[in-house]
Amino acid sequence: MIPSTMTRFAAWSGVLAGLCIGLPGVVEVFTGETALTSLVLGVAPALAVPLLVVLHLRQSDTAGRLGAVGYAMNIIGLGLFGGAGFSLNVVLFHLDTPVVKELLSGPPRFALLGSAVVFAAGTILFGIAMARAGVHPRVPAVAYAVALPVLALAAPLPDSPFISAIHGVAGAAVAWLAVSLGARVPALSGR
């Protein structure tokens, strides 16, 4: 059994992660990328970790091997791509374009791409496992399996309305999954 405090923490953390993914995409349609939207997006992966753990724990008995493999790849990919995303959004954002191009012309480019591929593959597998297990709502599980990998693999592309829309869908899927966790947490009586 998962402690209710852990589930509540994961739910709140997941809602914040979803907002940190979705809101910058909406804002950037009007403003373009800013230091603030980049910072907010950069912290989203760290906020998503507790949610991912509890999503897995909730479905581990019914998700089988696919759920376990998907979770393992997703959590490792989240760590790798979360670090890469933080670097891109918070550190490299403030450097001049020629400097960034120089930095990303060599091995770091392959490391960033590799982290995106591991994250995308893990997210697809874990999203499929969620949809098949039926423990979590299917619509956000499928959106999770589709939107987050597209977002990761599109990270090197210039900002566009399409990228902003994907941010919105991905953020909504993460927040929806988080809210669905919170809806199932029994209230603690007398505490």
What are these regions (language model features)?
Residues 1-191:
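Hydrophobic, aromatic-enriched alpha-helical segments typical of multi-pass transmembrane helices
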